[in-house]
Amino acid sequence: MSRYIPDDNLSYPVLISIGGRSGSGFYLNANDGSYLVTAKHVLFEEDLKNKKFTLWDKTVTFSSYSKDPTEKTPLVLNANLELVEVKTHPVFDIAIVKVSIFKEKTPEGMWITEFIDGITTKQIGEKHFTVGVPLNSCRKYEDIQVSNEIFVFGYPNSLGIHEKSQEDNELDYSRPLLRKGIIAGKNDLKRTIIIDCPIYQGNSGGLVMECEQVNFERKFFALGVVTKFIPFVENMKSLQYGTVNTSIENSGYGVVVPVDTILEFIQKEKQAAT
């Protein structure tokens, strides 16, 4: 029985756990290695008054699953952020962490990677088969088509009622969820993508994939990373007292930073390091 989305695409989501909090991310395979991509606020607490960013904690774990749908044990990477440098975009809500360098390919086309200092795992010793978004699956901002179908990958942790026993929860919060929507529009001034798809707490940093129908074949492309939802703001004014009560709700639309912005950022950071 065929699946609507390829197995390797379903293994892209990464659960990020840091300082008692969690968010979403994904691995992106650049030319020199694999990078963890997420939203900046997943890893950093923002001090708006002083315009400062502070890491929620000095250690973080990245959990993901292999492309084998029968594999139930996640691949867990532990990152010491005192040894691993986190790069943050100067404009967008984006953070990247280089986790490994590519050593060689297996006969099946999988990269055998070697972790950089500060990244460890208990599962497979020093080598790890990563499942990241390849460069040839990344769609440029200029090529993104409004109205096309999209999928949001992530770990929304604000859904459901969190019970003390995992068995009592409706959701398994250690497994990713998909959400289907469309590309609602593009903001050319900000160079961002607007999606018609609800974004919840925990989805931040998650990957968005576009599905394109070519003849009778479905093709999937990485669009970018979820950074926030667009609020619906309603002001209610008292006619008697003149007071205003503001209600802010989730509009069902979200903002995505395109993947080519992330690739440009990675390239600039590489050039600055040489």
Question: Locations of the language-model features?
Answer:
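C-terminal cap/linker of serine protease catalytic domains
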Residues: S2, K219-T274
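Catalytic histidine site
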Residues: Y4-N78, I96, S100-F102, I182-K186, ...
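Short, charged beta-turn/beta-strand-edge "cap" motif at the junction between a beta-strand
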Residues: L43, P156-L159, V214-N215, I230
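Hydrophobic alpha-helical segments and helix pairs
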Residues: L77-G132
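Short glycine/Trp-rich loop-beta-loop segment that forms part of the substrate-binding cleft
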Residues: I119-D168
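A mid-sequence, solvent-exposed acidic-amphipathic segment
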Residues: P156-G202
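Catalytic nucleophile loop of clan PA
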Residues: C197-V226
